[in-house]
């Protein structure tokens, strides 16, 4: 694969002069020296110029996107993404049409790559003056300006060469990831290093930009430190996680650790094409890099994930919200933050690991010993979220080797389930990010453990809604997960509840902001449950003093969660939906002016029960947890006056947060309780016991 050239300036030229430059010997040679072969453009001019002269103009319904971080932008190179239903042949036809219409206006363009296997579209070098024209082309969905991505490692001590300190008998995981292929998109790799010799195949793929301040590319062998180190972390003989995993290297970062979104997209398409041509076992793609938020980068990751590929990425080293970066913000990617030997967030000078709701878990990322490219027996220590992501890629390879049939959703749930819980000091994170950031550090499961019997659930937070009264927030589960309950949270306490609704054939959790509120979060409880069938039963406001009630009336269905929403601004003594331990077991009860929603599910052997923990007066936090063997599916507050900020699940614990009444001037003595719905599958438990 050829190298993607860096950006250059473009000038509009009169059409006769343009043709002279293209067709004249001297002009052709000069242009080829700078920008390559323009034969395709000449053919496009000859074949399409006349036919498109009278083509009708289309209203620009497509959108334009660019990186929010100006220094990372690469104007002059654009990814043109076509609509989902576009036939693959239209990619090349649309590209030729753009070239022909640009030439009519006196502009040079160059098609750098046409995507066929990853997404419909193409990569083009052109003047920004042509964007309006390109956005009006038929089939165009959106256009994104190219931008930079960066390796996410910080050298801890480059001068020190350290021998590996691990003993072989300390780490003998089952199968060692031998059934899994790991693709590493990074710098090149020193494949003859003793840590990885015979385990790595360096492909001929290369798509990197020129280095800053230069007009050339250094040989890959001269700058393979970052990739070599990460390859050793993933599958090194002494210091690797998955010692048996095979690894393939694609070069998308230059010697300065810098690449482009477009170059990485071409690398992902290379992987997809390889997968189609020669299907193999489970694939893990390690993306130890980060750039600004990119719609097209995230879309490409989604495509690859839905094709069965597991993608693991670095959260980023900017001490910032990971949702502002790609591919860390892609929901289908497993995003990894970095911790040190004390399980605390990694600090890198004035920066450090990224955090927030887009991070799935953390992993070791400080002072990590691995292979050094200084010599074939050298080792070096490095730090960063790249190293953390490499650990999780190795763990993923181990799990997939033990259970090759695992889906991405199942793998993610297992990574979360087996992580060390509540070991990170949350005070390191900004206050508004603490509740959103998972307190999880990755760990391998017990070597003899098969978790097929376990009911797995995780908590998914939405983005923060706007502050307007009608603003809403939506939380979604992954493709193979089922939404079992929905809750909401507002730091101001001003919200209008939440509900489960259908959207695009999937259940989603929608939370509603209230007048005077600062915004709200929707919180989905997403679970893996075979053969599950769920529905929502709703009761409108009862208008009676006894409150609104709704229950699961279908035979065999059990209550997995309750939610409510209301239109009035202040319910006063609002009582949100709860499952009470006394009375009807499958019933949600709420305020008479609220609509109450019961999430009712049926699955083989599914059984649920309620746990409630209350305190006699309002406190800032009340919790209740499910016992071992049971999984939290629903979390609600009781009673839920204006002091209650909301409820959410942390691992297997239901947390209800309230405002400190001492700061509000309130004299309320109303009790507050956390109500948890705990479920398990007798069918899965029995299957596990039979295996034992």
Curated annotation (Swiss-Prot):
Q: Which domain of life is it from?
A: Eukaryota
Q: Which family is this protein grouped under?
A: Belongs to the peptidase S8 family.
Specify the Peptidase S8 domain's residue ranges.
155-444
What are the BP-aspect GO terms? apoptotic process; cholesterol metabolic process; low-density lipoprotein particle receptor catabolic process; proteolysis; regulation of neuron apoptotic process
- Which residues does this entry mark as bearing Phosphoserine? 47, 688
Q: Name one GO cellular component term.
A: lysosome
Sites annotated Cleavage = 152-153, 218-219
Propeptide residues?
A: 31-152
Classification of source organism: Eukaryota, Metazoa, Chordata, Craniata, Vertebrata
Q: Which InterPro entries match?
A: PCSK9_C1, PCSK9_C2, PCSK9_C3, PCSK9_ProteinaseK-like, Peptidase_S8/S53_dom, Peptidase_S8/S53_dom_sf, Peptidase_S8_subtilisin-like, Peptidase_S8_subtilisin-rel
The region annotated as signal peptide is 1-30
Q: Where in the cell is it found?
A: Cytoplasm; Secreted; Endosome; Lysosome
- Described purpose of this protein according to its UniProt entry: Crucial player in the regulation of plasma cholesterol homeostasis. Binds to low-density lipid receptor family members: low density lipoprotein receptor (LDLR), very low density lipoprotein receptor (VLDLR), apolipoprotein E receptor (LRP1/APOER) and apolipoprotein receptor 2 (LRP8/APOER2), and promotes their degradation in intracellular acidic compartments. Acts via a non-proteolytic mechanism to enhance the degradation of the hepatic LDLR through a clathrin LDLRAP1/ARH-mediated pathway.
What is the official name of this protein in its record? Answer: Proprotein convertase subtilisin/kexin type 9
In this UniProt entry, the residues modified to Sulfotyrosine are 38
Q: Where is the active site?
A: 186 (charge relay system), 226 (charge relay system), 386 (charge relay system)
What does the record note on quaternary structure? Monomer. Can self-associate to form dimers and higher multimers which may have increased LDLR degrading activity. The precursor protein but not the mature protein may form multimers. Interacts with APOB, VLDLR, LRP8/APOER2 and BACE1. The full-length immature form (pro-PCSK9) interacts with SCNN1A, SCNN1B and SCNN1G. The pro-PCSK9 form (via C-terminal domain) interacts with LDLR. Interacts (via the C-terminal domain) with ANXA2 (via repeat Annexin 1); the interaction inhibits the degradation of LDLR.
PTM annotation, UniProt? Cleavage by furin and PCSK5 generates a truncated inactive protein that is unable to induce LDLR degradation.
Q: Quick one: which gene encodes this? A: PCSK9
What organism does this protein naturally occur in?
A: Macaca mulatta (Rhesus macaque)
Which cysteines in this chain are paired by disulphide bridges? 223-255, 323-358, 457-527, 477-526, 486-509, 534-601, 552-600, 562-588, 608-679, 626-678, 635-654
Disulfide bond is among the record's keywords: yes
């Amino acid at each position: 694969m050829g190298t993607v050239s860096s950006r250059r300036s473009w000038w509009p030229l009169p059409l006769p002069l343009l043709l002279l430059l293209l067709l004249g010997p001297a002009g052709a040679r000069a242009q080829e020296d700078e920008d390559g072969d323009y034969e395709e453009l000449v053919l496009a001019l000859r074949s399409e110029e006349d036919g498109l002269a009278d083509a009708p103009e289309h209203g620009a319904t497509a959108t334009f996107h660019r990186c929010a971080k100006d220094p990372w932008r690469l104007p002059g190179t654009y990814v043109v993404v076509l609509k989902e239903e576009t036939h693959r042949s239209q990619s090349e036809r649309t590209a030729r049409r753009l070239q022909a219409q640009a030439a009519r206006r006196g502009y040079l363009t160059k098609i750098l790559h046409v995507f066929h296997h990853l997404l419909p579209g193409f990569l083009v070098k052109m003047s920004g003056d042509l964007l309006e024209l390109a956005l009006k082309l038929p089939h165009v969905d959106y256009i994104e300006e190219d931008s930079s991505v960066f390796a996410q490692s910080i050298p801890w001590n480059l001068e020190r060469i350290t021998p590996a300190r691990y003993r072989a008998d300390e780490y003998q995981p089952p199968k060692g990831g031998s059934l899994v292929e790991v693709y590493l998109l990074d710098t090149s790799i020193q494949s003859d290093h003793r840590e990885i010799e015979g385990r790595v195949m360096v492909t001929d793929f290369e798509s990197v930009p020129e280095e800053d301040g230069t007009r050339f590319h250094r040989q890959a062998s001269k700058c393979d430190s970052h990739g070599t180190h990460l390859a050793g972390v993933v599958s090194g003989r002494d210091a690797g996680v998955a010692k048996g995993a095979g690894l393939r290297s694609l070069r998308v970062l230059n010697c300065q650790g810098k690449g482009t979104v477009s170059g990485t997209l071409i690398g992902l398409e290379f992987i997809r094409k390889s997968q189609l041509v020669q299907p193999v076992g489970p694939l893990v793609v390690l993306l130890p890099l980060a750039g600004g938020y990119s719609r097209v980068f995230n879309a490409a990751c989604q495509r690859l994930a839905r094709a069965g590929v597991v993608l693991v990425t670095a959260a980023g080293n900017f001490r910032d919200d990971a949702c502002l970066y790609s591919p860390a913000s892609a929901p289908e990617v497993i995003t990894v933050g970095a911790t040190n030997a004390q399980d605390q967030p990694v600090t890198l000078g004035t920066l450090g690991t990224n955090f927030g709701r887009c991070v799935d878990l953390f992993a070791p990322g400080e002072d990590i010993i691995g292979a050094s490219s200084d010599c074939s027996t050298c080792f070096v220590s490095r730090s960063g979220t790249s190293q953390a992501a490499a650990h999780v890629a190795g763990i993923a390879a181990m799990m997939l080797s033990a259970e090759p049939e695992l889906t991405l959703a199942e793998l993610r749930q297992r990574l979360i389930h087996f992580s060390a819980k509540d070991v990170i000091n949350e005070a390191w994170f900004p206050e508004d990010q603490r509740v959103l950031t998972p307190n999880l550090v990755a760990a391998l499961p017990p070597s003899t453990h098969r978790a097929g019997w376990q009911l797995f659930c995780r908590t998914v937070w939405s983005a923060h809604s706007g502050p307007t009264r009608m603003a809403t927030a939506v939380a979604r589960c992954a493709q193979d997960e089922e939404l079992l309950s929905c809750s909401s949270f507002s730091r101001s306490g001003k919200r209008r509840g939440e509900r489960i609704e259908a959207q695009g054939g999937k259940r989603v959790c929608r939370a509603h902001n209230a007048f005077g509120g600062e915004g709200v979060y929707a919180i989905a409880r997403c679970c893996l449950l075979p053969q599950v069938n769920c529905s929502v039963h709703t009761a409108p406001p009862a208008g009676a003093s006894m409150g609104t009630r709704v229950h699961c009336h279908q035979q065999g269905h059990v209550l997995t969660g309750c939610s409510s929403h209301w239109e009035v601004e202040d319910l006063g003594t609002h009582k949100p939906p709860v499952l009470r331990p006394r009375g009807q077991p499958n019933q949600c009860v709420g305020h008479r002016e609220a609509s109450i929603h019961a999430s009712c599910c049926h699955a083989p052997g599914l059984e649920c029960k309620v746990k409630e923990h209350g305190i006699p007066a309002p406190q800032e936090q009340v919790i209740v947890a499910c016992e071992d063997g049971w999984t939290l599916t629903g979390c609600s507050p009781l009673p839920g006056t204006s002091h209650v900020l909301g409820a959410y699940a942390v691992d297997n614990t239901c947390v209800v947060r309230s405002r400190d009444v001492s700061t509000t001037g309130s004299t309320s003595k109303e009790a507050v309780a956390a109500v948890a719905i705990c479920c398990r599958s007798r069918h899965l438990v029995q299957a596990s016991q039979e295996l034992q």
